[in-house]
Amino acid sequence: MDLHNIREDYSKRELSEADCADNPIEQFERWLDEAVRAQVNEPTAVNVAAVDGRGRPNSRMVLLKEVNSEGFVFFTNYHSRKGRSLDAHPFAAMTFFWPELERQVRVEGRVERLAEKLSDEYFESRPYQSRLGAWASAQSEVIPNKAVLVAKAAAVGLKHPLHVPRPPHWGGYIVIPDLLEFWQGRPSRLHDRIQYRLLDGGWIRERLSP
């Protein structure tokens, strides 16, 4: 397969410093709102990259479940590869990509586990079958076949026919950012890149060369 000529010339929008909020979280919320209104497919999907105890990088897609003044929240199995990596090295990089808008956002920062109360509250909001799955799946572990997983979920359902409590190995993380970059595709590969970096408790906004 020849990949050399697979390319797009971006021209839909531009990003100027005058259009950017002083606070990067506010800027992110603006762009996320525009992605939702534009009916971007899975606008909250984000790639999370981490480094494990051996220094090997790994990444995967998760769903952003909250953004607030503190940072970016997602939920997972703490015993999964990503959970073990984040516990070993509590830093992460996140990338949102909204091709319909020719935009991406990068986030870097320190990672903390979310308070158990907040993880409990979110878990209670999940569909019943999803809560069963959180108990049934030993995420990232090798299993002999799919039937084993289905049987485990059924067993959890028999044990908890009405209320499924949150497993202790499942909960949230928050990425507390110290760097965000907003990328807007432009013609001739002269893309707009506006970066915010945290310095002495305040945000510095600057333009990067594409």
Swiss-Prot record:
Keywords: Flavoprotein, FMN, Oxidoreductase, Pyridoxine biosynthesis. Its EC number is 1.4.3.5. It catalyses: pyridoxamine 5'-phosphate + O2 + H2O = pyridoxal 5'-phosphate + H2O2 + NH4(+); pyridoxine 5'-phosphate + O2 = pyridoxal 5'-phosphate + H2O2. The keyword Oxidoreductase applies. It is an enzyme of class 1 (oxidoreductase). One of its GO terms (molecular function) is FMN binding. Binds 1 FMN per subunit. SUPFAM superfamilies: FMN-binding split barrel. Pfam families: PNP_phzG_C, PNPOx_N. Gene3D superfamilies: Electron Transport, Fmn-binding Protein, Chain A (2.30.110.10). GO terms for biological process: pyridoxal phosphate biosynthetic process; pyridoxine biosynthetic process. Homodimer. HAMAP family: PdxH. This is Pyridoxine/pyridoxamine 5'-phosphate oxidase. It comes from Neisseria meningitidis serogroup B (strain ATCC BAA-335 / MC58). The lineage of its organism: Bacteria, Pseudomonadati, Pseudomonadota, Betaproteobacteria, Neisseriales.
